Amino acid sequence: MDRKKDPSNNLTERRVSKVQRPNKKKVRNQVESLSRNLERNKEGQLLQTVSKGHLEADSGHSLGREKENGELGIRSIFYDKDWNPRGTAPSHYRNIPYNPATFKRRTEVQARLGNLENIKIPK
């Protein structure tokens, strides 16, 4: 018998015969596997959509510098109406937004100026 005509030795012929006469059990398993993958992909896409929505919502609230100059204005923890109205961070410090719950003062700050009482303190 010729090698090319013998289906057991011809790889192309074997592949074609598998497609033409598929095994029912293998087909069922492949369909189930594909349906599980499709469900998993849908869940992943949903999570990606939710994460993307959170990212877009959070993009307005920066935890670091805003723009190139690092100014946050009144939202900065370094903001002071008299001394630092632009809310610029000192050099080598990261500017973050002010959170009243996190940075709440427990006591009133008392100035200890000694004999320097003539210096004006911003209120």
Curated annotation (Swiss-Prot):
<comment type="subunit">
    <text>May interact with the nuclear pore complex.</text>
</comment>
<protein>
    <recommendedName>
        <fullName>Altered inheritance of mitochondria protein 4</fullName>
    </recommendedName>
</protein>
<feature type="region of interest" description="Disordered">
    <location>
        <begin position="1"/>
        <end position="42"/>
    </location>
</feature>
<feature type="compositionally biased region" description="Basic and acidic residues">
    <location>
        <begin position="1"/>
        <end position="16"/>
    </location>
</feature>
<dbReference type="GO" id="GO:0005737">
    <property type="term" value="C:cytoplasm"/>
</dbReference>
<keyword id="KW-0963">Cytoplasm</keyword>
<dbReference type="Pfam" id="PF12622">
    <property type="entry name" value="NpwBP"/>
</dbReference>
<feature type="compositionally biased region" description="Basic residues">
    <location>
        <begin position="17"/>
        <end position="28"/>
    </location>
</feature>
<comment type="similarity">
    <text>Belongs to the AIM4 family.</text>
</comment>
